[in-house]
């Protein structure tokens, strides 16, 4: 999207604030339905981020897959569950909860220190984007695949790890 600089910066700050507030709403709201709506708001703000960075295909995929399918599925699952079990014994923490939060905090801090200590400019990627000669003859989906496997390999893998953790959390919540 070609916007003047100050408007673009304002929209980035506005959407970033929306993502942070929505994420806090997901974590801090005690009603699971409100948390699911807050998660949908975060997904919509992320989609608008993609639109601001001229990634219309990724924005459409974000809206269709995450907001349209996954968030609606989460809402249906939460609405069909028994709501009374969320509020009894809410304030009690067991030893397992404390140990789990300690392990998660240690893993998060080690991941952050690894990211900050890594020299990202020294990493050799498998294919550089300047090695692809015939860009005019490649379709948009092929260009997207090439970009995901070269320039955006690290964010793509980090997103897969985040989705894996979310899946494991959903399985753990469903087992209880």
Curated annotation (Swiss-Prot):
This is NAD(P)H-quinone oxidoreductase subunit 6, chloroplastic. It is found in: Plastid, Chloroplast thylakoid membrane. NDH is composed of at least 16 different subunits, 5 of which are encoded in the nucleus. The chain crosses the membrane at residues 10-30, 32-52, 61-81, 92-112, 152-172. It catalyses: a plastoquinone + NADH + (n+1) H(+)(in) = a plastoquinol + NAD(+) + n H(+)(out); a plastoquinone + NADPH + (n+1) H(+)(in) = a plastoquinol + NADP(+) + n H(+)(out). GO terms for cellular component: chloroplast thylakoid membrane. Disulfide bonds: none annotated. Its main location: plastid. NDH shuttles electrons from NAD(P)H:plastoquinone, via FMN and iron-sulfur (Fe-S) centers, to quinones in the photosynthetic chain and possibly in a chloroplast respiratory chain. The immediate electron acceptor for the enzyme in this species is believed to be plastoquinone. Couples the redox reaction to proton translocation, and thus conserves the redox energy in a proton gradient. It is a multi-pass membrane protein. Its EC number is 7.1.1.-. Belongs to the complex I subunit 6 family. Keywords: Chloroplast, Membrane, NAD, NADP, Plastid, Plastoquinone, Quinone, Thylakoid, Translocase, Transmembrane, Transmembrane helix, Transport. One of its GO terms (molecular function) is NADH dehydrogenase (ubiquinone) activity. InterPro entries: NAD(P)H-Q_Oxidoreduct_6, NADH_UbQ/plastoQ_OxRdtase_su6, Nuo/plastoQ_OxRdtase_6_NuoJ. It is an enzyme of class 7 (translocase).
